[in-house]
């Protein structure tokens, strides 16, 4: 707020801001309502939102105003800046509302005024002083420099340092295009009477006054009459905006108070380029003084330096001579020369004449975003700040998208933080200018796997949509205050998890809308992901449509009202809510935009988590591995005794994570097994019916209710369960009933917020107890934990998944999957369709059944059930999966009901626990049998009533305990690890060609579980909903690029697929695999595989029956299954799996095709099949 000595007139009428220089994007401005958290010194002088908020102080010739800088989209944040509140207040006091009322109106369009001081540095530049009048003579080629004449001479000055003399930007109170929430942010730390005039973002050209009074910010629309008069109240109209501001600075006249102190603007804009000479970026090395080192990397180091010409602190990126070619180094510099955006780190110059090479950029004093998030104060960096940061990054990426650039390394570590939470995207070493739709990286290029899109990992191809994927991961980093993505998951497992449909869980406290955006960014098909323009608009909409502060206050207030865990939260003054009556607005109701400061609760500015939690049904991703977990959502429950662990929330969840506390000793499996067997009376039911007035059990994303059969049971508590649920991303719009629950109850729509510390503890279920004081029950054992991992798998502690045991014991968990809660994108409907039917009652029958003998390799364990004409033992040797016979999955033509794993009928409308076994038997497009990802532990020598044979991803056999075995001793019941053994060569293939099209109705003929399996009756079985229709085709919106799928042998073709042609295209159909058909890698050579591929290619080109082509194709699939693990390079392995997946899908289409085999030119199915075979051959020959 510089004091105005001279006065410059203003043209009549409302003056609109004139474009000047490079206009930035509005993306850098947040749109959330917030007030500065307590305890933080408000940097009142910094304006970090607006693009055209240059400090206006126009004085007559010979007079000089204060040297206070301004803010602009091209802000170069210096390590120093405006002082704190005192300086802003002192300068505000000196402001005179009459500063621009007098003086002649200038009609010369070339007459400009200086906004900032500028010191000449050679190259014919001219020194100017703020407030000095200048006449513009011309511009350089890119318009970033203006040639001007002043009383001191003629020369070049930066274009963004001057403005037309009649522009609104000369005024100290005019801030240009600023959103409503950004204005509130600017005024939040100021005093009563602080104000600014801004242009509306949503309605360009519409001006408003934002005025702070008594902790609130009021917004008044400035109206314009037909005769160009401006007014706030209809009784007081003025010719110019300056007159209006002057009037309301003396009398309120309808405003809540008078206009006293313009909000300050203190940062100078960035000077683009070294000089006005176009494309001159080479700097003199002697102009840079190197200071201390900031950090180092693979290619060089980064230092703090001073650009002596401008006395400007800069960042200097150096490169080692032997690590990077000069051309590659210049490519990065060339990319940075072309980008100019307030949220992109600006290139200032380069030194490339001799090594070591320098890239000189603006300096961001707070370092990279990742470290900043990990070390910041949660009281300062609140949910609003996090959302603001994400908005800025989306704005920068939208700019790159429009410029047709790809970044290729977007992550929190490559974003830098400046004053007042300004974030800028940096590190353009991998960025490229796109000349087509995609960019293919050279062989051997390295990429950050956890941030790289699947198509980029598989094919080395990049597009702006692969940056969108990385942006979704970056959002997850922001929401978790800098946690590492996919915590506890090894790099080699990430791609395999993604192809199974796994996506990271919803961070604790993350609003559903933000998580929906993350999931949209993680769509498998690039075409299905949103553009950065859409993501940026989505963030802006979030700010405008709702108050984040109010959501934080509402969510945390609800939790605090029911919990005694959060008494430490600081008692901040409560701000008035929107519903409170506005003061002094009776005579100005038509112009008041509305009360804008959201009411904040005592906890709103100190939320330990990044974003707020939702009380509505939201999508959660699977439970995470044990290596990294966060606090349990149930830590806020009143009954602290029943939680598996406690923790101090005072430091925020991430600080607790960094302490690396040791997890408690997990419960013994034997006792847990006995507990579940000996206490069959315990029932569990979790419902997903959420409402804004959720009960205490709902506070963490799910509710727990006792079984209807036993109403006296207290609600069970679940520490880790987001089970069958509905994903909220765009591709799940057609999904079945997710979080809203179903008529049948049961495991329906569980969401819950899983964090690394939560799952670091034992994942399990607390059973309902007849009395609340009975605390003797123990958590369920981790069914797939590291203690029973196969010794042959690396990173055991990171790869194992902690899964709750199935309390119904109606299914066998035969395979390690990502989580019980992970639902593949393409199969959400099917995941919601699965629920175990009512099972046999009592535990005694399980003890009375004779033990089943260990089955030989290649055989399958069939469930003990009544003979079914639809499924006979002779028909099904190839149908079983790892020892469980899976009946045809798909509704048949005659309306038969689908049978689930272990012969348990499934209801089409009910939601069920998507157990690992079910994932094997039902979800074909999301599981890769050849990928060693989180697979079930190897068990040996178990005294189970029945021993079933399972297979891991390598085709190795292992034995499984029955679900409810009778335990006689502790140690004997504990599963033991055995080293996997290679499977023998496959036996002759048996095919099922005919099969009846119906199967028994589960309501009329309940099926029995496998021998030795105890299946107590549960509420889920008793509350079956009516069967619903099964879709006859793939789910709408199925990704263009299906997840890579390792082939399945011909014997695994379900008879339902042959009986029903349309069923062949179902996404949710599961082709099961006979374990013994795995061909070991040492028996498949490259030559044999290529020979088999040539054989299939030859068969395709000849008129042969479809059945013969299918046989040959499945033979090739078997060869591929055995060969995939011998591919040395990871990227080639990814591409190979993708090609094999396409081949498998092509064979399925051929199998159900009614068209007779012909030549590839006439049959599109054959064309597709031939291209798949060729792609496999190409990958193998690389």
UniProtKB/Swiss-Prot annotation:
Residue numbers carrying N6-acetyllysine:
778
Q: Which residue intervals are annotated with compositional bias (Low complexity) in the record?
A: 20-30
Q: Which GO terms describe its molecular function?
A: ATP binding; magnesium ion binding; manganese ion binding; non-membrane spanning protein tyrosine kinase activity; protein tyrosine kinase activity
Reported impact of residue 317 to M:
Loss of kinase activity
Q: Any keyword Cytoplasm?
A: yes
Gene Ontology biological process terms from the UniProt entry? actin cytoskeleton organization; actin filament bundle assembly; actin filament organization; adult walking behavior; aggressive behavior; alpha-beta T cell differentiation; auditory behavior; Bergmann glial cell differentiation
Residue ranges of every copy of the Protein kinase domain listed in the record: 288-539
Q: In which tissues is it expressed?
A: Most abundant in adult mouse brain, especially in synapse-rich regions.
SMART domains from the xrefs?
A: FABD (SM00808), SH2 (SM00252), SH3 (SM00326), TyrKc (SM00219)
Tell me the segments the record calls region CAP.
2-106
The UniProt annotation puts motif Kinase activation loop at: 427-451
Q: Which residues carry this modification: Phosphotyrosine?
A: 116, 161, 174, 185, 218, 231, 261, 272, 299, 303, 439, 459, 568, 684, 719
Which InterPro entries is this protein grouped with? ABL_SH2, F-actin-binding, Kinase-like_dom_sf, Non-receptor_tyrosine_kinases, Prot_kinase_dom, Protein_kinase_ATP_BS, Ser-Thr/Tyr_kinase_cat_dom, SH2
Q: Describe the task this protein carries out.
A: Non-receptor tyrosine-protein kinase that plays an ABL1-overlapping role in key processes linked to cell growth and survival such as cytoskeleton remodeling in response to extracellular stimuli, cell motility and adhesion, receptor endocytosis, autophagy, DNA damage response and apoptosis. Coordinates actin remodeling through tyrosine phosphorylation of proteins controlling cytoskeleton dynamics like MYH10 (involved in movement); CTTN (involved in signaling); or TUBA1 and TUBB (microtubule subunits).
Question: Per the entry's comment, what about the domains?
Answer: Contains two distinct classes of F-actin-binding domains. Although both can each bind F-actin, the 2 are required to bundle actin filaments.
Protein's name according to its UniProt entry: Tyrosine-protein kinase ABL2
Q: Which gene encodes it?
A: Abl2
């Amino acid at each position: 707020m510089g004091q105005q000595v001279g006065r410059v007139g203003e043209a009549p009428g409302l003056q609109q801001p004139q474009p000047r220089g490079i206009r930035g994007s509005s993306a850098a401005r947040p749109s959330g309502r917030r007030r500065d958290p307590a305890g933080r010194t408000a940097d009142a002088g910094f304006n970090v939102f607006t693009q055209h908020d240059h400090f206006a102080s126009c004085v007559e010739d010979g007079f000089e105003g204060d040297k206070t800088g301004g803010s602009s989209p091209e802000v170069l944040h210096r390590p120093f800046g405006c002082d704190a509140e005192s300086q802003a207040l002192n300068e505000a006091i000196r402001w005179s509302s009459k500063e621009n009322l007098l003086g002649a109106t200038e009609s010369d369009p070339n007459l400009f005024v200086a906004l900032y001081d500028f010191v000449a540095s050679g190259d014919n530049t001219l020194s100017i002083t703020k407030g000095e009048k200048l006449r513009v003579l011309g511009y350089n080629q890119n318009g970033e420099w203006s040639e001007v004449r002043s009383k001191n001479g003629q020369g070049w000055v930066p274009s963004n340092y001057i403005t037309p003399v009649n522009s609104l930007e000369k005024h100290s109170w005019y801030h240009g295009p600023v959103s409503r929430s950004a204005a509130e942010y600017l005024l939040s730390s100021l005093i009563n009477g602080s104000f600014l005039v801004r242009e509306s973002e949503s309605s360009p050209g519409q001006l408003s006054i934002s005025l702070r009074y008594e902790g609130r910010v009021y917004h008044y629309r400035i109206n314009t009459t037909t005769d160009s008069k401006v007014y706030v109240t209809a009784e007081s109209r003025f010719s110019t905006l300056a007159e209006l501001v002057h009037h309301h600075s003396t009398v309120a006249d309808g405003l809540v108070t008078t206009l006293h102190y313009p909000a300050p603007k203190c940062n100078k804009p960035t000077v683009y380029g070294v000089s006005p000479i176009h494309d001159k970026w080479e700097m003199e090395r002697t102009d840079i003084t190197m200071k201390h080192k900031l950090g180092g990397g693979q290619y060089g180091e980064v230092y703090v330096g001073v650009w002596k010409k401008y006395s400007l602190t800069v960042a200097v990126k150096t490169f080692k001579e032997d690590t990077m070619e000069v051309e590659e180094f210049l490519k990065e510099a060339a990319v940075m020369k072309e980008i100019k955006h307030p949220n992109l780190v600006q290139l200032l110059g380069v030194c490339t004449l001799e090594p070591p090479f320098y890239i000189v950029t603006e300096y961001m004093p707070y370092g990279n975003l990742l470290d900043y998030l990990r070390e910041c104060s949660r009281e300062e960096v609140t949910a609003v700040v996090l959302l603001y940061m994400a908005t800025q990054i989306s704005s920068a990426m939208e700019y790159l998208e429009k410029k047709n650039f790809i970044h290729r390394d977007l992550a929190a570590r490559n974003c830098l933080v400046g004053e007042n939470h300004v974030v800028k995207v940096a590190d353009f070493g991998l960025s490229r200018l796109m000349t087509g739709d995609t960019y293919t990286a050279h062989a051997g290029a390295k990429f950050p796997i956890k941030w790289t899109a699947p198509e980029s990992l598989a094919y080395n191809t990049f597009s702006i949509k692969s940056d969108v994927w990385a942006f979704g991961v970056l959002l997850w980093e922001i929401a978790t205050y800098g946690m590492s993505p996919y915590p506890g998951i090894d790099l080699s497992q990430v791609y395999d998890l993604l192809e199974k449909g796994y996506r990271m869980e919803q961070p604790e406290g993350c609003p559903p809308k933000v998580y929906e955006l993350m999931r949209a960014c993680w769509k498998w098909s690039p075409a299905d992901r949103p553009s950065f323009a859409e993501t940026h608009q989505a963030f802006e909409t979030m700010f405008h449509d709702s108050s984040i502060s109010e959501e934080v206050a509402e969510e945390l207030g609800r939790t605090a009202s029911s919990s005694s865990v959060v008494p430490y939260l600081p008692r901040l003054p409560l701000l008035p809510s929107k519903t409170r009556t506005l003061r002094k607005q009776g005579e100005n109701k038509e112009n008041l935009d509305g009360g804008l400061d959201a009411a904040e609760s005592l906890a709103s500015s100190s939320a330990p988590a990044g974003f707020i939690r939702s009380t509505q049904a939201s999508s959660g991703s699977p439970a995470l591995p044990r290596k990294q977990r966060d606090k349990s959502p149930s830590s806020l429950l009143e009954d602290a005794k029943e939680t598996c662990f406690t923790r101090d929330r005072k430091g925020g969840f991430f600080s607790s994570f960094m302490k690396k506390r040791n997890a408690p000793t997990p419960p013994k499996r034997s006792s847990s097994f006995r507990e579940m067997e000996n206490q069959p009376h315990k029932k569990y039911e979790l419902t997903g019916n959420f409402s804004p007035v959720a009960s205490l059990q709902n506070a963490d994303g799910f509710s727990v209710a006792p079984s209807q059969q036993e109403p006296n049971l207290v609600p069970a508590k679940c520490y880790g369960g987001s089970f069958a649920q509905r994903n909220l991303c765009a591709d799940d719009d057609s999904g079945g009933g997710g979080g809203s629950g179903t008529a049948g109850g049961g495991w329906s729509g569980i969401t819950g917020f899983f964090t690394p510390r939560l799952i670091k503890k034992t994942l399990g279920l607390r059973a309902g107890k007849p009395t609340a004081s009975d605390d003797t029950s123990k958590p369920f054992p981790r069914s797939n934990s590291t203690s029973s991992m196969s010794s042959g798998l690396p990173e055991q502690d990171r790869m194992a998944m902690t899964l709750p045991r199935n309390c119904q014991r109606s299914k066998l968990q035969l395979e390690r999957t990502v989580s019980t809660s992970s639902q593949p994108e393409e199969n959400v409907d099917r995941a919601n369709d699965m629920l175990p039917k009512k099972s046999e009652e009592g535990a005694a029958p399980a003890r009375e059944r004779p033990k089943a003998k260990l089955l030989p390799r290649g055989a399958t364990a069939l469930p003990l059930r009544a003979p079914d004409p639809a499924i006979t033992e002779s028909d099904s040797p190839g149908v079983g999966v790892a020892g469980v016979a899976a009946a045809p999955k798909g509704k048949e033509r005659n309306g038969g009901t689908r049978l689930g794993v272990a012969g348990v009928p499934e209801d089409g409308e009910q939601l069920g626990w998507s157990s690992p076994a079910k994932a094997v038997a039902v979800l074909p497009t999301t599981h890769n049998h050849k990928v060693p990802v989180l697979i079930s532990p190897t068990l040996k020598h178990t005294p189970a009533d029945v021993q079933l044979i399972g297979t891991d991803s390598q085709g190795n056999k292992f034995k499984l305990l029955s679900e409810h075995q009778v335990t006689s001793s502790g140690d004997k019941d504990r599963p033991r690890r055995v080293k996997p053994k290679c499977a023998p060569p496959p036996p002759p293939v048996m095919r099922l060609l005919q099969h009846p099209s119906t199967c028994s109705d589960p309501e009329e003929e309940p099926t029995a579980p496998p021998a030795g399996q105890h299946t107590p009756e549960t509420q889920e079985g008793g509350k079956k909903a009516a069967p619903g229709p099964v879709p006859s085709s793939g789910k709408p919106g199925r990704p263009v690029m299906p997840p890579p799928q390792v082939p399945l042998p011909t014997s695994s073709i379900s008879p339902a697929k042959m009986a029903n042609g349309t069923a062949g295209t179902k996404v949710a159909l599961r082709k099961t695999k006979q374990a013994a058909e795995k061909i070991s890698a040492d028996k498949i050579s490259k030559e044999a595989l290529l020979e088999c591929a040539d054989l299939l290619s030859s068969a395709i080109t000849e008129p042969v029956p479809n059945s013969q082509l299918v046989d040959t194709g499945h033979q090739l699939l078997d060869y591929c299954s055995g060969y995939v693990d011998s591919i040395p390079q990871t990227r080639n392995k990814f591409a190979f799996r993708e090609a094999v997946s396409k081949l498998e899908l092509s064979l399925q289409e051929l199998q159900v095709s009614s068209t007779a085999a012909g030549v590839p030119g006439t049959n599109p199915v054959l064309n597709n099949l031939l291209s798949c075979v060729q792609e496999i051959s190409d990958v193998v020959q690389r």
